[in-house]
Amino acid sequence: IDNVVDKDKFENLKALNDAELNVGYLSEVQILKLKKSMKETFNKGLSIKTLASTLISKDIIPHLYTEIDGEKVIKLNQDIRSLIVARTETIRLSGLGALENYKNNGIQKTRWTAAISDRTCPICLELNGRVFIIDSFLTDVEYPAHINCRCALSPVVIE
């Protein structure tokens, strides 16, 4: 990623993003249950909203709490948090599956395409249009870049 984004700028943006997410990490048990639910949902061809509902009904994704003035307050409710996890993990798996498909068909490069709008984050703006060798992308780049990332990966067949 060194040749794509100024390393200090990238690390600063990533640190801000990580700080926001660290309080919401899932336990190993929750991750295993999430994977199982995702597999079942995908195998049945169901939607992201259905996956989010499953995560709620099985109590896999709880409310995210914070403390304000010594009082425990809901920072992110279970409904919204489940939808965010379902959407982000679906995008991640879809993108990684696409990269494997590209590789299996002899395509060696991928292009990062950001959904450009007033909501596009600085990381995605920096990565937009960049071309990566798939093998190094899989080890060097975080995809999706953050929760609710709307970016896509496309094959590069002609440069």
What annotation goes with each model-predicted range?
Residues I1-A145, S154-E159:
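Domain-core detector
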